[in-house]
């Protein structure tokens, strides 16, 4: 694997796993629960993507770093949660960072495995939101992507940049960085300005 995608992937896993682990601490999970919800949050989207595109066994099962990173994130959250309490209100911001990194990596991998543009964009979105959906289900709360949050749309935008540059023959791994930045920026703006996706009751 190329250096940039690997580094971004591991950063994304850590950030997502940290957000999931902090949630686990908040809702009184024990050490096992914190590690599990952290690992599921960090790895869930990528595993679902790999299974769907035929990249089996998933990367998470063939590279020890993919399991080591969420374990470290979980232990950090469990041990230092009193010190991390001041950043807990910003857990959605950490989630936004993971969303941006994962959506672009997901769409890139889908393209490498020969998917057409539209499915590749959808795989990027799935990679970005999948871990968060599983996290919310484990925490017994409605998934954030279903709560009218402006969440899947930023992932769609970041994935679309990757796919368009790929189709135009202009793709380079460094494209992943501005594409992820676009998704992260949109998500951060949504959090700051409280943007939400339209609901039926908003229109009719």
Range-by-range predicted roles:
Residues 32-40, 63-68, 88-99, 123, ...:
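Cytoplasmic-side transmembrane-helix entry/capping segments in multi-pass membrane proteins
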Residues 6-19, 37-40, 158:
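The first (N-terminal) embedded transmembrane alpha-helix
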Residues 1, 195-204:
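Intrinsically disordered, low-complexity non-transmembrane regions of multi-pass membrane transporters
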Residues 38-46, 70, 94-108, 126, ...:
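Small-residue-rich segments of transmembrane alpha-helices in multi-pass membrane proteins
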Residues 17-27, 50, 75-88, 133-144, ...:
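C-terminal ends of transmembrane helices
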Residues 2-13, 58-72, 116-128:
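Structural signature of hydrophobic alpha-helical transmembrane segments
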Residues 36-40, 47-53, 122, 126, ...:
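Short, structured motif recognition centered on aromatic/hydrophobic residues
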Residues 1-4, 51-61, 105-120, 164-175:
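Helix-coil boundary and interhelical linker segments in multi-pass alpha-helical membrane proteins
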């Amino acid at each position: 694997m190329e250096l940039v995608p690997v580094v971004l992937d591991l950063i994304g896993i850590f950030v997502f796993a940290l957000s999931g682990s902090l949630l686990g601490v908040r809702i009184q999970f024990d050490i096992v629960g914190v590690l599990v919800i952290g690992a599921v949050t960090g790895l869930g989207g990528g595993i679902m993507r790999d299974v769907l595109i035929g990249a089996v066994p998933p990367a998470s099962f063939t590279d020890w770093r993919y399991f080591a990173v969420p374990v470290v994130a979980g232990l950090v959250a469990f041990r230092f949660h009193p010190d991390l309490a001041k950043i807990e209100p910003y857990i959605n911001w950490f989630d936004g960072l993971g969303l941006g990194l994962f959506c672009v990596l997901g769409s890139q991998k889908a393209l490498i495995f020969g998917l057409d543009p539209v499915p590749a964009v959808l795989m990027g979105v799935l990679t970005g939101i999948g871990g968060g959906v599983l996290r919310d289900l484990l925490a017994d709360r409605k998934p954030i992507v279903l709560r009218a949050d402006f969440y899947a749309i930023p992932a769609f935008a970041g994935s679309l940049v990757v796919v368009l540059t790929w189709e135009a023959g202009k793709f380079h791994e460094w494209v992943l960085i501005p594409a992820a930045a676009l998704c992260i920026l949109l998500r951060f703006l949504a959090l700051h300005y409280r943007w939400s996706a339209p609901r039926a009751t908003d229109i009719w």
